[in-house]
């Protein structure tokens, strides 16, 4: 995966430079419209199970972001379905994935890759058993097959009566399946395709289905 590592370093550096005006504008908007810290920082499980700090633009109220950031192994990976916790600006940032732009710094540092499993909190990563733990051989990614398939995860969870149960029994196992497929059928060409589909909001054929 030498090509993947090289691409991550070069593309993340270029991305940070090219997108710096947008990063500054978003940071200023958050500072003006959402009093409090600009960034949301949280410990996530990285490659080989090593914890690292992920950086995102803050999209929730200060009280809830602080609660999320301080959660330990009992935290969940479930996207919040309580829209009252997300600010109007935060909702727009999430809709266009602008809240994830600071993760380019994580990619440049080597904590993450452009494509891979989403970095999970310890509570859910600890549920991986047996061969499932092979997923931890990968660097977590900004996007990936599971991210593409569940790009509307918040909407899905808000439509079911028991979001936690649905996530535990349906979404989480399916994400594990897709991430294992990604590990065992790695393709740099597919990486590029997934990045393009993420940016353009398009679907693609992967692992015998449309994601």
Language-model segment annotations:
Residues 40-85, 146-172:
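Short, glycine-rich, amphipathic interfacial segments at transmembrane boundaries or analogous
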Residues 9, 85, 174-176:
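N-terminal alpha-helical segment
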Residues 1-2, 77, 81-85, 100, ...:
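Juxtamembrane loop-helix boundary motifs flanking transmembrane segments in multi-pass membrane proteins
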Residues 105-211:
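Hydrophobic structural segments characteristic of membrane proteins
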Residues 1-64, 182-211:
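A hydrophobic, helix-centered structural microdomain
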Residues 94-103:
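Short acidic-aromatic low-complexity motifs
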